[in-house]
């Protein structure tokens, strides 16, 4: 007879194997059925999204006005230059989180990642091609390199860069690849246990095992909120908005306004049930309610003024937000 477990199995085995340059395979097992995917998927997301790296976020090239331009004497147009630049992986020296780098190269020359090394940055992809300069030509450009995590599209930094610079999509993460597989393993004649096989590859900025440990650290910190001291709110406290004296008249049913049958029916057909819904409407929006005539509009306007909330009242942001939440729950 199979024994009934009283607690989940605790994994006991882990192996780490180097399978290439800046590339490792981590195997951990045995996990209860379903547990492996529960852990492997967020670990992969954290590896790709939380690892700290450095990337160019803006570029200015002398003689180029935009990313679809070209520069005389440079074989690559600006678009291809940017593609090549994104493949160059930077590492900032010191504790700075943002630096502006200025470069100028005279042709004929072939510019690679190693040519961008200076007192402020190192390059972990020194052989990556950047540009080819013809004879009698000069390539002058400036870069803004920043520290960050994950991926940040250029739209999010467009308003943060100096005038004249081209914003760039920033790939900060030093993790090039993070994949996992879930395999079954046999434990005490039970084949339903699982193994996580995780492969991690970095660009050389950090070791894969360091990236893995960083991801574990982030996961533990994210989970720590659930391990802090907390208390359970009573049901009464969760409905405290109803007791707010400023919200109370706004949460009344429209019937409380004692409108004429014509005005009430018009609002009812429009799906309006509470006084607060009318107060949140602007004057023009109320006038646009289907079949609401001028006489009914004037009546509603007068009734709302009587309770101290004229049509289009300028409610405080926190009151408006709390009212909207309560109305959504009540409807």
Curated annotation (Swiss-Prot):
Keywords of this entry: DNA-directed RNA polymerase, Nucleotidyltransferase, Transcription, Transferase
Top-level lineage group: Bacteria
CDD domains: RNAP_alpha_NTD
Region (Alpha C-terminal domain (alpha-CTD)): 247-331
Example GO molecular function: DNA-directed RNA polymerase activity
Keyword Nucleotidyltransferase: yes
Family annotation (InterPro entries): DNA-dir_RNA_pol_insert (IPR011262), DNA-dir_RNA_pol_RpoA/D/Rpb3 (IPR011263), DNA-dir_RpoA (IPR011773), RBP11-like (IPR036603), RNAP_asu_C (IPR011260), RNApol_insert_sf (IPR036643)
Catalytic reaction list: RNA(n) + a ribonucleoside 5'-triphosphate = RNA(n+1) + diphosphate
One GO CC annotation: cytoplasm
Enzyme nomenclature, EC number: 2.7.7.6
Swiss-Prot/TrEMBL GO biological process terms: DNA-templated transcription
Listed SMART domains: RPOLD (SM00662)
Pfam families: RNA_pol_A_bac (PF01000), RNA_pol_A_CTD (PF03118), RNA_pol_L (PF01193)
Annotated spans, Alpha N-terminal domain (alpha-NTD): 1-230
Oligomeric form and interacting partners: Homodimer. The RNAP catalytic core consists of 2 alpha, 1 beta/beta' and 1 omega subunit. When a sigma factor is associated with the core the holoenzyme is formed, which can initiate transcription.
Family: Belongs to the RNA polymerase alpha chain family.
Function: DNA-dependent RNA polymerase catalyzes the transcription of DNA into RNA using the four ribonucleoside triphosphates as substrates.
Domain comment (free text): The N-terminal domain is essential for RNAP assembly and basal transcription, whereas the C-terminal domain is involved in interaction with transcriptional regulators and with upstream promoter elements.
Name the UniProt record assigns to this protein: DNA-directed RNA polymerase subunit alpha
